[in-house]
C-alpha cells in the first residue's frame, strides 16, 4: 500500500506503517553516517546534549556527493545501515522514530525499534541521482569537519522508501524470503 507521510514522524504514524508499505516522505530529516553517529554517542557519554533534536526525528544514512550548479545536493543514495547498528539503539531510546538506509539490521536494533515504536525504511541503492531530485534543500548543521559525513538537515518532497522493519518488528527481509521460497 502507498502512503504519504510528513515529518516529524510520531508514534501515531509509525504504528500505522506496516512492513512492505511503500511510503513517500515529505518534510525535514537529518543525514548522518557512522562518523557522525559515533561523535553523537561520544558526546552523550561525556554528558553533553546532542547537537540535533532527536525527538520524533528521521535520520537518513547517506553521504552525498557534491552538488551540481543549481541543485541543493549531489547524488544522495543510501549507505548500508549495519554501520550504524552499534549507535542506533541509543538514539532510538532517546526518541528517534525513523531510519532510512539499505541492508539488514541487528537484533539489538530491531529490539530497539519495537521497544520505541519506530520504523526502519529502505531507500533504493544505486538510485542516488534520482533520490536527490526529491531533496529541495540541504544544509550542514554540525560536525562540518567530517566533510561528506557531517550532519545535514535536508528538506524532502515525496521521498520514496519502503518500510522494511515496522514498529511491531515485522521484517520484510525475512518475510520476503519465505514468501518467494514458497513459489
Question: What residue ranges belong to the model's regions?
Answer:
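Active-site/ligand-binding-proximal alpha/beta "capping" segment
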Residues: 87-88, 164-183
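Short, structured beta-strand/loop micro-motifs enriched in basic residues and often containing a Trp
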Residues: 1-9
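Feature captures the catalytic cores and cofactor-binding loops of soluble hydro-lyases/lyases
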Residues: 31-32, 36-159
Amino acid at each position: 500500500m502507498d502512503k504519504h507521510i510528513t515529518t516529524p514522524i510520531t508514534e501515531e504514524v509509525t504504528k500505522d506503517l506496516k512492513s512492505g508499505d511503500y511510503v513517500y516522505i515529505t518534510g525535514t530529516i537529518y543525514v548522518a553516517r557512522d562518523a557522525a553517529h559515533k561523535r553523537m554517542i561520544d558526546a552523550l557519554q561525556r554528558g553533553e546534549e546532542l547537537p540535533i533534536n532527536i525527538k520524533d526525528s528521521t535520520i537518513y544514512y547517506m553521504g552525498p556527493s557534491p552538488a551540481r550548479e543549481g541543485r541543493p545536493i549531489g547524488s544522495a543514495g543510501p549507505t548500508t545501515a549495519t554501520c550504524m547498528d552499534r549507535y542506533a539503539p541509543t538514539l532510538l531510546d532517546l526518541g528517534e522514530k525513523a531510519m532510512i538506509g539499505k541492508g539488514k539490521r541487528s537484533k539489538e536494533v530491531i529490539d530497539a525499534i519495537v521497544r520505541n515504536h519506530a520504523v526502519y525504511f529502505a531507500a533504493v541503492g544505486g538510485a542516488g541521482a534520482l533520490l536527490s531530485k526529491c531533496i529541495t534543500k540541504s544544509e550542514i548543521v554540525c560536525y562540518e569537519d567530517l566533510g561528506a559525513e557531517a550532519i545535514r538537515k535536508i528538506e524532502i518532497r515525496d521521498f520514496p522508501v519502503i518500510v522494511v522493519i515496522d514498529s511491531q518488528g515485522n521484517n520484510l527481509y525475512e518475510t520476503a524470503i519465505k514468501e518467494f521460497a514458497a513459489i
